[in-house]
Structure formats: C-alpha cells, structure tokens
C-alpha cells in the first residue's frame, strides 16, 4: 500500500510539472503569439488557410456553432462511409467486411462526438484503412473541436463589448497543428520505442508451444492511434482489450506515460485559463477543486480494490486482481480507472466490470458528475465553468446580490445556457437507462443478474450520455437498439452543451466588465473551492443517487451475504 501511495503522489507531481509549461504554451497558441514551433509551422499554417479558403474574420456564436456542426456532420458521413465500404478499400490485408448500418452509425457518432464507445473489437472488425484514416483522423479533429470551443468560451470572459468569439477554422487548425500533432508525434515515438505495435504488415501466424497449435497475432498502426486516443481524451482502443492489451500498453512505464497523456491537456487547459483571464489564482482554484475530487476518487477505488471486501478477507493478500493485468497491479489499474473516467477518456487497462462494487461506483460517479473533474479536452473545462457560474448564482441568491464572475454579471440568459450545459447529460443518461432496462434486447445483453446487471446497463448509458466511452464489459453492446439509441445520445450529449457554451460565450463577450467591490464573491479562495465541490457533487448525487442505490450500492451490500 505504501508503494501505491508513493506511485500516485509521483504521478500527480509529474503531471503538474508537465502541465504548467504546456498550459503557458497553449495560451500563446490561443492568442496567436509566436511560439518556438512558429518558424517551422507558420508556413504550413498560412498554406492551410489558403488551401481551405479560410478568412480570419471573427464569428458570432451562431456562425461558430454552424461551422462546428457542419464540420462534424461531414466527418460523421465520411467515417460511416469508410466503415461500411471498408471491404472495397485498400489497407485491408485480413479482408474485413463492411460494418452493419447500425454499428457503423454508432461508431461514427461515437468518434465524431469524442466518445469512442466501441461495440466492436478493432482487430476482428476493422481494416487498417478504417482505423488510421477513418478513426484516427476523427480522434484529432474531435479533440481539436473541443479545445477550439473552449478558446471561444474563454474569449467571452476576457473580451468586452464584442459581437464575435473568434474563428472556428483558425482555432481548429492552430490547435491541431501546434498542439495535438507535435504531442502525438512525441508520444507515438515513445510508445514505439517501448514495444507498442506500429506496422502495416499482415497479421502474423505463429506456432504455439502447446501441441503446435496455430495462433493469429494481430498487428497494425496502433501507436499512432494510441497517442492521440490518450492525448485527445478519445479512448477508443486499436485492439478490443484496449490498454490492457500488451501491444497497446506493454509495461508499467507505458502505463505511466499513457495515464499522464490522458490528463495532461485537460490539466494544462486549466493553467491556460488562469493565464488567459490574467489571474492565475482563478486557475489554481479550479485546479484545486478538480484535484481534490480526483484524489478522493483514486483513494476510494484503491482501498476498495486493495482490501477487496468481506468475500476476500483472509484469502487475497494482493487485493482483488480479477480483471487486472499483473504488470499493473491494483495501484496502476485503480489510478488508470480514475484517470480515464475523470477525463472523459474511456480507455481501460483493466476490466471495469470486474472491479469491486465500490471500486466500480467511483468511475461511474466521475462520469455522472458531468465529466468536469478535468473532463474531455476543452469540454471538461467549459463544463466546469458552467458549474462555477451556477455556484456563483446560488451564492448570489443567498446574499441578495447580482452574481458576477470575472467581472461579468450573470443574467437569466446566461443561466439558461448553463442549465443546458449541466442538465442535458444526466437527463440523457437517466432517460436512456430507463428505456433500455425495459427492452428485451438490452436485458439479453446483460451477463449478470440482480444489482450488478443493472450496474452494467447504467454504466453503459452513463458512458454514452457523458461522452466517455468505457464500459462494463459484461454488457453486449452490439444490438440495433443500443447502437441507434446510443448514437443519438452521444451526439446530443456532445453538441447541445457545446452550442450552449458558445451562446454563453457570445453573451459574455458583449458585456462590459464591472469593478469588483467589497461585496463581490471571491472565486479564488478556499470557501469558493468548497462551494464549487459541493455544487458539483450535489448535482450528481441528486441526479443519480436513486439509480446508484439500485446498482453498485445494492451490489456492495450483497457481498455481506
């Protein structure tokens, strides 16, 4: 246990050390300031603008949102076409056939929405072309879209009396060129150096030591996809077992760098936010709130898995190792589970369905908080900004003052947008789960009975409704109902809050700043951090406690029988 504590502490310190300079760098990218890569990348940037016919004229929220939706729609159609027609496309050495309509629809929606929910196993269903040209490209652009929208939201708070919030195409291109591509290249090379597969060769057939039986070894351009799947909080694995598979995550060292990659950009964006609003204490307050909840979650999962519960008393000395890789152990698996669900990533290095009831409760609850404990790249922070505004609004009601945040007054229109930001994911999750448990096809998809069976369904629709993508593996996801309903949920959960954030940004950008007074609520002290954590947890608890009581909480109490 002492080793696990030291490992987790080292991870947090290293994460912060890496995130601070990256956050400063991303701030310069956001405002268009020259960075050390400018000499190399500026000509590429200018050529790209000319090639796409992009002007640098600012956009209103409506035009920005239309650009995001149109771009995502084109990506959706392209990915769906690639998946259904992959049997006729190149780079298909294993002769993979096209996916069914419902599965292709679900997968396209999943990757366009930055969810990466997978109702298939990559090595058994997709060609190299589909993986690299279809899905990997979407991993880049969906992540870049989230960060671009965050840039627009931040401009809303730092600009005054403006009718625009930036240019989507410029933001998208700069994020991809200056942030995602360089980081992904570095990480991909690092992964390849550690033994992660990167090849376009045919699958290998080897003779095993047992009776000379033949075994097919899947290969593929995995490292390049894994790099952006982690950095972009996408999470979709090249192989079905995701980061539990040795070809994706071969050692404890690669496990460390993949966990760092999952949280690096979300944490760095908080640093960038503090820089952008010219008050680093604002960023530190948000970081502290996120980190407190994250650390509590890591501790809860680790204790639950290490001490396992009454069934294992006096039996297991190394904790519950069911569904875990020996090379990662309880500590590496618990930290990964917390990171991937706190950051809206969804990659897994252990089977979450095999976690203890309380160990599985924490990742589920992280998602149900709205993926704002770091959250997805871009989307996590603008979601947290929605909770900050809600906290300021509640505090203003308590003292009878007009609420303000960063010098901008909070008005009824702003609160309407905040409600869309905060309430759409839980509504989709609960409605989807309620409908699903009544469907015979979903009931047949559940491998467990009782409370754990309900937990499998709740986890699946929580994951899709909050754009995470991880799953309890006992849930068989490839059914027409789950594919179609899940796809609609993922698209709505992604784009309704996104559009609401843009309209919130424009309304804020049109306001002038008001001077802080002695009665202004400070949003950078310990009291506000406590209020913010309370509001985030309370909204999640009020929304999901009844469902959690029927699932993982009831599952926990069955272990005492």
From Swiss-Prot:
Its main location: membrane. It is a multi-pass membrane protein. Pfam families: KdpA. GO terms for cellular component: plasma membrane. Keywords: Cell membrane, Ion transport, Membrane, Potassium, Potassium transport, Transmembrane, Transmembrane helix, Transport. One of its GO terms (molecular function) is potassium ion binding. It is found in: Cell membrane. The chain crosses the membrane at residues 4-24, 65-85, 133-153, 177-197, 253-273, 285-305, 380-400, 417-437, 484-504, 528-548. InterPro entries: KdpA (IPR004623). The system is composed of three essential subunits: KdpA, KdpB and KdpC. Belongs to the KdpA family. Part of the high-affinity ATP-driven potassium transport (or Kdp) system, which catalyzes the hydrolysis of ATP coupled with the electrogenic transport of potassium into the cytoplasm. This subunit binds the extracellular potassium ions and delivers the ions to the membrane domain of KdpB through an intramembrane tunnel. This is Potassium-transporting ATPase potassium-binding subunit. It comes from Listeria monocytogenes serotype 4b (strain F2365). The lineage of its organism: Bacteria, Bacillati, Bacillota, Bacilli, Bacillales.
């Amino acid at each position: 246990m002492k080793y696990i504590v030291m490992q987790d502490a080292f991870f947090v310190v290293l994460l912060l050390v890496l995130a601070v300079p990256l956050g400063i760098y991303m701030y310069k990218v956001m405002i268009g300031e020259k960075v050390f890569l400018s000499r190399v990348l500026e000509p590429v940037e200018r050529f790209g603008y000319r090639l796409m016919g992009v002007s640098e004229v600012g956009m209103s929220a409506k035009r920005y949102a239309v650009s995001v939706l149109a771009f995502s729609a084109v990506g959706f159609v392209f990915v769906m076409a690639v998946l259904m027609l992959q049997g006729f496309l190149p780079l298909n050495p294993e002769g993979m056939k096209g996916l069914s309509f419902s599965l292709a629809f679900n997968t396209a929606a999943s990757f366009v929405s930055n969810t990466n929910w997978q109702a298939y196993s990559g090595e058994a269903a997709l060609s190299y072309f589909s993986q690299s040209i279809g899905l990997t490209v979407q991993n880049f652009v969906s992540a870049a879209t989230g960060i671009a929208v965050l840039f627009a939201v931040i401009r809303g708070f730092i600009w005054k009396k403006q009718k625009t919030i930036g240019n989507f195409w410029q933001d998208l291109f700069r994020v991809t060129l200056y942030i995602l591509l360089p980081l992904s290249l570095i990480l991909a090379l690092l992964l390849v150096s550690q033994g992660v597969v990167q090849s376009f060769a045919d699958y290998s057939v080897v003779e095993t030591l047992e009776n000379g039986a033949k075994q097919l070894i899947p290969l593929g351009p995995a490292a390049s996809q894994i790099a952006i799947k982690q950095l972009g909080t996408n999470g979709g694995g090249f192989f079905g077992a995701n980061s539990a598979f040795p070809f994706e995550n071969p050692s404890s060292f690669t496990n460390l760098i993949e966990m760092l990659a999952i949280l690096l950009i979300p944490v760095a964006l908080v640093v960038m936010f503090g820089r952008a609003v010219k008050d680093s204490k604002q960023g530190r307050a948000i970081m502290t709130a996120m980190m407190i909840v994250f650390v509590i979650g890591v501790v809860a999962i680790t204790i639950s898995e290490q001490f396992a519960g009454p069934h294992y008393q006096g039996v297991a000395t190394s904790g519950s190792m069911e569904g875990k890789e020996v090379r990662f152990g309880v500590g590496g698996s618990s930290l990964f589970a917390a990171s991937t669900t706190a950051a809206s990533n969804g990659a897994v290095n252990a089977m979450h369905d095999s976690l203890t009831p309380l160990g599985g409760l924490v990742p589920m609850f992280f998602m149900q908080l709205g993926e704002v404990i770091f959250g997805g790249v871009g989307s996590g922070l603008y979601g947290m900004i929605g909770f900050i505004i809600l906290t300021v609004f509640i505090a203003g009601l308590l003292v009878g003052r007009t609420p303000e945040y960063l010098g901008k007054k909070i008005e009824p229109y702003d609160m309407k947008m905040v409600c869309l930001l905060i309430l759409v994911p839980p509504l989709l999750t609960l409605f989807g789960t309620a409908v699903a448990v009544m469907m015979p096809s979903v009931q047949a998809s559940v491998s467990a009975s009782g409370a754990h069976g309900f937990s499998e369904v709740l986890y699946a629709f929580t994951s899709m409704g909050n754009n995470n993508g991880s799953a309890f593996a006992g849930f068989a996801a490839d059914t027409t109902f789950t594919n179609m309903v899940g796809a609609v949920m993922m698209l709505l959960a992604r784009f309704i809050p996104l559009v609401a954030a843009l309209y919130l940004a424009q309304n804020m950008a049109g306001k002038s700043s008001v001077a802080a007074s002695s009665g202004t609520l400070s949003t950078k002290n310990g009291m506000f951090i406590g209020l913010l954590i309370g509001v985030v947890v309370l909204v999640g608890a009020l929304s999901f406690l009844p469902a959690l009581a029927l699932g993982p909480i009831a599952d926990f109490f069955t272990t005492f029988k």
